[in-house]
Amino acid sequence: MIVIILLFISIIVFLSVIQPQPSKNKSRQQADSGYFGYSDHSSHHDGCSSDGGFSDSGCGGGGGGD
């Protein structure tokens, strides 16, 4: 009986691992692309806000790192 349960669990895990992979890859690529694009744009546009201490001096001392 334990063998049957383990076999059943193995099949479920196997199917779960195989099925979402292609779909997950696509979603991940889109998410990565969108995230990087947004992050990059945001960083360039108002880096002072994003980076805080790093771009603080270049932004005109808006945040004051400390």
UniProtKB/Swiss-Prot annotation:
Region entry Disordered, spans: 21-66
Signal peptide coordinates: 1-25
Record field: compositional bias (Polar residues): 21-31
Keywords: Signal
Protein's recorded name: Uncharacterized protein YxzE
Recorded name of the encoding gene: yxzE
